[in-house]
Amino acid sequence: MVKIDLITGFLGSGKTTFIKKYAKYLLDKGMNIGILENDFGAVNVDMLLLQDLMGDNCELEMISGGCDKETHRRRFRTKLIAMGMCGYDRVIVEPSGIYDVDEFFDVLHDEPLDKWYEIGNVVTIVDAKLEPELSEEADYLLASEAANVGSIILSRAEEATKEQIENTIEHLNRALEQVQCKRRLDQEIMRKDGAELSEEDFDKILKGGYVAENYRKMDIDEKKGFDSLYFMELKISADELKTQVAKMMQDPECGGIFRVKGFVKDDAGSWMQLNATGHEISMKPIGDGQEVVIVIGEQLKEDCIRKYLEN
């Protein structure tokens, strides 16, 4: 049977960065792997960030979001059936930061997937400087992604104080309590950034497995709180984009922005990758890009955001 891992994490937590390192670790062990990118929206930016992993022993597949729940589940199942015929040793699923974890477990219990795949590890990436106050919906997503983990990685741990790290762990356990989950996390948490993980750490993650936990479910779709907005072919410089994103993330009139990501060309015509969260905004060179900026958050106000990006 093919081992299949689920790597989750709330928006901007650093899932893709971790997956690049985890995938390299698996490749160095001689494994043949497939990575399935599953984005919340209709445009998949993270796929571009993983292209340098592609080779004879690593293939990338994608499921686009932007559809209803049942359609997305059907696409996920169909893609896993196709990937089950490719001879992989291991498949890594990277869903959006807004994801119903039950979909992963439910689909893998369907025939014929239950005979082809064996769940390996469930890993969640959490920002070590997690915001102390999140909405009920956001806390639910956090809890649902943490409830079944074998390992939790605290991203940006090297930037956080000891107090911030402990507050984040308390927040995780508080979120679990709010959804009536009996589990409390401690030993499963690696208090170090993905960049600091050693081969021994990855050995431990590979053996981490998962835990089947019960918790009270919330239908996020009914809340209609999470949005993703797409802005294509913006006529804006890289420096100006970074400045405007910083401003709009501080403007409550734009809604609750969790993350902004995308690509833009600099003055020399080279691609730059934008990645913005509540803690930092970065603009880094990248080989290939796509003229798109994606804004993800709760109760977003498109007209207000558009003023920052287009004027």
Task: Report each predicted region and the residues it spans.
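C-terminal accessory "lid"/substrate-recognition subdomains
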Residues: 148-154, 159-287, 299-303, 310
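Short, hydrophobic beta-strand segments that form beta-sheet elements in well-ordered domains
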Residues: 34-36, 261-264, 295
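A short alpha->loop->secondary-structure connector
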Residues: 111-117, 142-144, 169-178
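Short, glycine-/small-residue-rich phosphate/pyrophosphate-handling segment
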Residues: 140-141, 148
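A short, charged/proline- and glycine-enriched loop
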Residues: 1-2, 289-291
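Nucleotide-state-sensitive switch-loop elements of NTP-binding domains
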Residues: 2-13, 17-135, 140
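Short, conserved catalytic or adaptor-binding loops enriched in Gly and charged residues
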Residues: 51-55, 145, 179-183
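Short, well-ordered beta-strand elements
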Residues: 291-297
